[in-house]
Amino acid sequence: MRPPSPLPARWLCVLAGALAWALGPAGGQAARLQEECDYVQMIEVQHKQCLEEAQLENETIGCSKMWDNLTCWPATPRGQVVVLACPLIFKLFSSIQGRNVSRSCTDEGWTHLEPGPYPIACGLDDKAASLDEQQTMFYGSVKTGYTIGYGLSLATLLVATAILSLFRKLHCTRNYIHMHLFISFILRAAAVFIKDLALFDSGESDQCSEGSVGCKAAMVFFQYCVMANFFWLLVEGLYLYTLLAVSFFSERKYFWGYILIGWGVPSTFTMVWTIARIHFEDYGCWDTINSSLWWIIKGPILTSILVNFILFICIIRILLQKLRPPDIRKSDSSPYSRLARSTLLLIPLFGVHYIMFAFFPDNFKPEVKMVFELVVGSFQGFVVAILYCFLNGEVQAELRRKWRRWHLQGVLGWNPKYRHPSGGSNGATCSTQVSMLTRVSPGARRSSSFQAEVSLV
């Protein structure tokens, strides 16, 4: 009887890499990965050698040479027992060395591995196996969580982008920037799904192989979309701060600068990272983050998070000054409630929550960081779409106007030549919204535009 094939060597290496990533310090991850790949290459060489020797052997009475995905068992006469050392791959799993495994050659062929499967026979204890099972369940839950989050965000963002695009009364610089931010969230969600499809569903998560061009292209697209999303969050901060800090400025001129920052800067860093990976680390699917090349991607993102957080503090400070005119009574708490409300509205728009883990080491609370950045972060696009489109007073008024018009056309067959009270010029709605801050803020155009941001509900 031929024994069932054990776990393939590549999957053992993937498990070893996962354990090393979760338990080991960040500085030793590159060395562990190299050691893991050395074992994979050694096992592949042994596999090839075993098959070649098996083809050259003459037929013998007994059990022929066999490869069980980890060990090459020599041809053996019936009735004998072969004892071999545990594969070296288990050095990555267990500190217990010197263990052996054996098989017996019987009339029915090779017996099962003794004293048990490789993990038991070679010292992979129950604690390590239980830890791996818990981590597998945890990673599965995280993947399910961010899949739901990105799916929900993708649906709401597509609708929100369509609304801002189709209604001409909503066309203005502020909403154009919102649309680009929505598109960056859409691309990020799509990139996550494409990356998961390339890495997990196609089975290309092995870091020791060369990796397909399609898988690498998916990772390049993913890195670009993530960085572009962070830079469009930065653009939102820059735009709001400019409205408050600059007396007169050309929105059209600044808008093209925002386009360059939001889409151009990420493309530059992504191209540099791609060229560096091709020349220095062209292995696997380019999904490793344990080398100095990762800073080509991580550095600009951290910079954008830090700058946006500083802008957030400055805007809150200016907003507090605007909400506290000299004639207001100290006992009046309404300005502070408006400030708290405005602050909560700006947090998802600026991505302020990313500052919590941005500058901690990669091995600091990895599970908490993973849940916060992947699961919670996946719902950011959904929250932004709700706050800055569906709960926006301008959008709701325009939707009600369109609904009344469609209703009259459908029920009465009437096609009114409707003209908006604002005079019909594009963008008028964006700069004339009455906000909760109007009573204490100047009526200037740039101030009213900012008020529209912090008083959407």
Swiss-Prot record:
The keyword Signal applies. Residues 31-141, 197-216, 277-291, 360-367 are extracellular. The keyword Cytoplasm does not apply. Glycans are attached at N58, N69, N100, N290. Pfam families: 7tm_2 (PF00002), HRM (PF02793). Disulfide bonds join C37-C208, C50-C72, C63-C105, C86-C122, C215-C285. GO terms for molecular function: G protein-coupled peptide receptor activity; peptide hormone binding; pituitary adenylate cyclase-activating polypeptide receptor activity; vasoactive intestinal polypeptide receptor activity. It is a multi-pass membrane protein. GO terms for cellular component: plasma membrane; receptor complex. PROSITE patterns: G_PROTEIN_RECEP_F2_1, G_PROTEIN_RECEP_F2_2, G_PROTEIN_RECEP_F2_3, G_PROTEIN_RECEP_F2_4. InterPro entries: GPCR_2, GPCR_2-like_7TM, GPCR_2_extracell_dom_sf, GPCR_2_extracellular_dom, GPCR_2_secretin-like, GPCR_2_secretin-like_CS, GPCR_2_VIP_rcpt, GPCR_2_VIP_rcpt_1. One of its GO terms (biological process) is adenylate cyclase-activating G protein-coupled receptor signaling pathway. Belongs to the G-protein coupled receptor 2 family. Interacts with ADCYAP1/PACAP; activated by both PACAP27 and PACAP38 neuropeptides. Interacts with VIP; the interaction results in VIPR1 activation. G protein-coupled receptor activated by the neuropeptides vasoactive intestinal peptide (VIP) and pituitary adenylate cyclase-activating polypeptide (ADCYAP1/PACAP). Binds VIP and both PACAP27 and PACAP38 bioactive peptides with the following order of ligand affinity VIP = PACAP27 > PACAP38. Ligand binding causes a conformation change that triggers signaling via guanine nucleotide-binding proteins (G proteins) and modulates the activity of downstream effectors. Activates cAMP-dependent pathway. This is Vasoactive intestinal polypeptide receptor 1. It comes from Homo sapiens (Human).
